[in-house]
């Protein structure tokens, strides 16, 4: 059931990034402006990608544990732990989504 989520385009880390290079070319007249910068950590996109993948993995584990519990292969404690972990991941994803939507709405309300 949860495998259908992988097909969503919103989870693609590089979707929409192809137009960035053409935009910077048009802004800077074809010249590449380079400034020395140091990568101090993971990018925001990679962090969000990792969080979403962890959430999907937790949901998959909970789904498998639920099916095993129904079949009698897993005890109740394992099923409850997996479901609670999946619920926590889902709540984190919902909170993150709400913060992103709130930030977007704040930006759209700003005057130019």
Swiss-Prot record:
Top-rank lineage group of the source organism: Bacteria
Listed Pfam families: FliE
Cystine pairings recorded for this chain: none
GO biological process: bacterial-type flagellum-dependent cell motility
This protein's UniProt keywords: Bacterial flagellum
Ranges in a coiled coil: none
Compartments where located: Bacterial flagellum basal body
Record-linked InterPro entries: FliE
Statement: the UniProt record of this protein carries the keyword Repeat: no
GO MF term set: cytoskeletal motor activity; structural molecule activity
One CC-aspect GO term: bacterial-type flagellum basal body
Family to which the UniProt record says this protein belongs: Belongs to the FliE family.
Name of the protein in its database record: Flagellar hook-basal body complex protein FliE
Organism name: Agrobacterium fabrum (strain C58 / ATCC 33970) (Agrobacterium tumefaciens (strain C58))
